[in-house]
Design a protein with these regions (language model features):
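N-proximal low-complexity "stem/linker" segments adjacent to membrane-targeting elements
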Residues: 1-30
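Catalytic core of nucleotide-sugar-dependent glycosyltransferases
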Residues: 205-211, 218-246, 258-290
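Donor-binding/catalytic cores of nucleotide-activated saccharide
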Residues: 96-199, 209-210, 214-223
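Short loop->beta transition adjacent to catalytic acidic/histidine clusters or analogous donor-positioning motifs
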Residues: 6-9, 30-41, 49, 61-65
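A conserved acidic beta->alpha catalytic loop
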Residues: 35, 43-52, 71-73, 95
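Short aromatic/hydrophobic "clamp" motif used to bind/position activated sugar donors
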Residues: 91
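Membrane-interface aromatic/basic loop that binds lipid-linked glycans or pyrophosphate carriers
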Residues: 268-331
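Glycine-rich, basic loop-to-helix element that forms the pyrophosphate-binding segment
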Residues: 69-86, 107
């Protein structure tokens, strides 16, 4: 079928240390049942052969554009650079170590047009150790955009970018916060707040790869913990606006846990800026002195004390967690 008069769909794909996976990712898009695509690969200064592999595919397929970063800039900057050159009427996001079903674009495009909505949300499947496990959502969260927004704030609808298919104008004036991890948790509420309609397509169309230890969604770093910390701080006032008292407490609980984890990880393997560490410490001081600090359990009470008064406890925790992760990966 000719592409004339068929909407262009842009797909933004950050690529970092994905040499063993990026080929499968690209080919899953090349072989879509809908072909009018703009495939944007942003290679984020990978030290492996990811960039060369992207270039090899681009030479053979004029739908592919490759952007190269000279150094690692982070996934938010990478996605923003992709968004800057989007030409399509619709936008999807895929991570370079994941892949998608061959009908993903066609099914999402059909749904968004027939249902006349701003965004289609679909299911993912988790791929780990060769096994694929579908993850489904409760359709009651999608009665209307207000219900979906509330469910998103509460983490009942995953905040991933990669299981959503947007009208391009949803991103017209929005960009991701750079220099932080878990940016999805911060940007999705902002995007959803500006939408008027939503549809849930109850099919697993995206395959999330848990086997890549270099995954851009990895949670095992001080930077990742700081990103989680910031995302929960960001969502507290959004929950307050909706009168979600219990979820405000949940956000505080998660922010404390993320902060004490981030401080411990950073003491064991320094990577955060001083102002980022101070940001977490100041928050923890305020919570420690608060009369209504949420219950965080004995373990995190010890880590909170360590972060504020006995850094050796936090550092030991960081080393222990990194050690456990190394053991887990070796099994």
């Amino acid at each position: 079928m000719e592409n004339q008069n068929r909407p262009l769909v842009s797909i933004v794909i950050p690529v970092y240390k994905a040499e063993n996976y990026i080929g499968k990712c690209i080919e899953s898009l090349q072989h879509q049942t809908y072909s009018n695509l703009q495939i944007i690969l942003i290679e984020d200064g990978s030290p492996d052969s990811s960039g060369r592999i992207c270039d090899d595919y681009a030479v053979k397929d004029d739908r592919i554009t490759v952007i190269h970063h000279k150094q690692n800039m982070g996934v938010s900057k990478t996605r923003n650079d992709g968004l800057a050159i989007v030409k399509g009427d619709y936008i999807a996001f895929v991570d370079g170590d994941d892949y998608v079903a061959s009908t993903m674009i066609e099914e999402c495009l059909t749904s968004i047009q027939e249902k006349q909505v701003d965004v289609v949300v679909f299911d993912i499947s988790v791929v780990e150790n060769g096994k694929t496990s579908p993850r489904h959502m409760d359709e009651n969260y999608f009665v209307d955009i207000k219900s979906a927004y509330t469910a998103l704030i509460e983490d009942k609808i995953p905040n991933y970018l990669c299981n959503k298919f947007f009208k391009a104008n949803a991103w017209k004036e929005i960009r991701l916060k750079e220099n932080t991890d878990f940016e999805d948790l911060m940007i999705m509420p902002l995007v959803f707040k500006n939408l008027s309609s939503i549809y849930y397509l109850q099919k697993s169309l995206y395959f999330y790869n848990c086997d890549n230890e270099n995954s851009i969604t990895s949670n095992w770093s001080a930077k990742s913990k700081y990103g989680l910390f910031c995302s929960y701080l960001y969502r507290q006032p959004l929950a307050e606006e909706l009168g979600m008292t219990d979820f405000v407490q949940y956000c505080r609980h998660r922010a404390i846990r993320s902060a004490v984890g981030g401080i411990g990880f950073n003491l064991a393997k320094p990577e955060l800026q001083e102002k980022q560490v101070e940001h977490m410490l100041e928050y923890l001081k305020q919570e420690e002195q608060s009369s209504d600090m949420p219950a965080i359990g004995a373990k995190y009470q010890v880590l909170l004390y360590g972060a504020l008064h006995a850094p050796f406890i936090s550092k030991l925790y960081g080393h222990m967690m990194f050690g456990l992760e190394r053991i887990k990966k070796s099994l």
